[in-house]
């Protein structure tokens, strides 16, 4: 469904396009937040950073990213993006595969108590510091 926005503990995403074969999202990561270290069984992803700075980790290897950086995340690769800056980090994510549900997430590590689940929980960024998820 295009135009759908979801809040997450680390920020938010908006679905820009969702059609058979691919899905496109705009993802905004709040300062000092990061996504789960996760992998997907049924999709690959391509990220293009449009604003901010941060760090991407893929299968244990980290690299800095900033506006203009492009990153390929192969299907099954463990990955995360972190915003260590003081402004939002925004990137466009293009998913390619045969299934794009939010339940195709295996969380390996998560700052918000969701590791080991595919459950997308929306909560405030304060949950990371208070221990609530």
Residue map of PLM features:
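Short beta-strand His + acidic residue motifs that chelate non-heme Fe in jelly-roll/DSBH
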Residues: 36-38, 56-57, 73, 79-93
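Short beta-strand segments
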Residues: 35, 61-63, 104
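A generic "binding-loop/recognition-motif" signal
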Residues: 31-33, 42-43, 61, 77-78, ...
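Short acidic-glycine-tyrosine-enriched beta hairpin
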Residues: 60-78
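Double-stranded beta-helix
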Residues: 1-8, 80-133
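A short glycine-rich, His/Asp/Glu-containing loop-to-beta-strand
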Residues: 2-39, 43-44
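Glycine- and acidic-residue-biased ligand/ion/polar-headgroup-sensing regions
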Residues: 42-55, 59-60
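A structural signal for the main folded, soluble domain(s) of proteins
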Residues: 16-19, 26, 50-53, 72, ...
């Amino acid at each position: 469904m295009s135009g759908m926005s979801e809040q997450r503990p680390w920020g938010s995403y908006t679905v820009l396009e969702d059609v058979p074969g691919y899905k496109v999202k705009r993802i905004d990561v709040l300062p000092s937040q990061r996504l789960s270290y996760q992998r997907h069984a049924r999709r690959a992803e391509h990220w293009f950073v449009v604003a901010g700075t941060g760090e991407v980790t893929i299968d244990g290897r980290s690299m800095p990213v900033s506006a203009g950086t492009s990153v390929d995340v192969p299907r099954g690769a463990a990955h995360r993006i972190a915003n260590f800056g003081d402004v939002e980090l925004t990137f466009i994510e293009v998913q390619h595969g045969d299934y794009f549900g939010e339940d195709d997430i295996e969380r390996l590590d998560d700052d918000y108590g969701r590791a080991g689940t595919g459950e997308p929980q929306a909560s405030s960024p304060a949950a990371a510091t208070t221990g609530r998820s």
